[in-house]
Regions:
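Tandem repeat scaffolds
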Residues: 1-215
Length: 215
């Protein structure tokens, strides 16, 4: 099923929407809580509410392999969602809530692998507390003001991202790609940077706080 250019208002999507496509649609005061959206595609869609203090709810929804491209999702709640394999490309996710969502497939309690694709998105002030984003594609995002406390991004591609200087040290980034990222505020004495990739020009911002001169 394919919806194009349609407007939905005040609708609770409790039916099965797996693999359904929505293109350039507008969702006003709609509720996707616990919706079955696995494999669905949203392109150029806007999700808005009458209450300016909260966004659209995808709480506890099944968004496995769901695609959001160029969508307006500011303040949306993905709390508790099952999101393994989900992708967000060029989306406005400012202030979105991803707490308790799952983007990992657990084989055992200590063995798992992660899958989520977030690229070119505005993630300012979004809440990712405790998330597992290991070895995921997370390039060219704005992370300023986001809550990254306890997040594991080990092995992830964070290249060309924009981070707040005070966020360094709140999350794990061993073996990740930090090329073309402003590393101001990152203290190499307080973080495990094993295997981290950077560009030559980034060395100065890491070493100058130690009194070293890169020439």
């Amino acid at each position: 099923m394919h919806y194009q250019g349609e407007q939905f208002e005040g609708k609770h999507f409790d039916e099965d929407l797996e693999a359904v496509k929505f293109e350039n649609c507008r969702f006003i005061d709609c509720d996707f809580t616990r919706a079955k959206l696995s494999g669905a595609e949203f392109s150029g869609c806007a999700f808005t509410t009458s209450d300016g203090d909260k966004g659209c709810s995808f709480s506890f929804a099944d968004i496995r392999d769901t695609s959001f491209r160029n969508c307006r999702l500011a303040l949306a709640s993905f709390r508790g969602a099952d999101g393994f394999g989900a992708e967000f490309r060029d989306c406005d996710l400012k202030g979105a809530d991803f707490r308790q969502a799952s983007f990992a497939n657990f084989i055992t309690t200590k063995s798992y692998f992660c899958s989520i694709f977030i690229t070119g998105c505005n993630l300012s002030y979004a809440d990712f507390e405790g998330q597992l984003f290991e070895k995921c594609e997370l390039t060219e995002n704005i992370w300023r003001g986001a809550n990254l406390s306890g997040v594991s991004m080990d092995g992830a591609d964070l290249s060309r991202g924009d981070f707040s200087s005070d966020s360094w040290g709140t999350f794990s980034l061993k073996n990740c790609d930090l090329r073309h990222v402003d590393l101001h505020g990152l203290d190499i004495r307080r973080m495990d940077l094993t295997g981290v990739k950077i560009c030559d020009w980034q060395q100065e911002s890491l070493l100058s706080p130690l009194g070293l001169v890169v020439s």
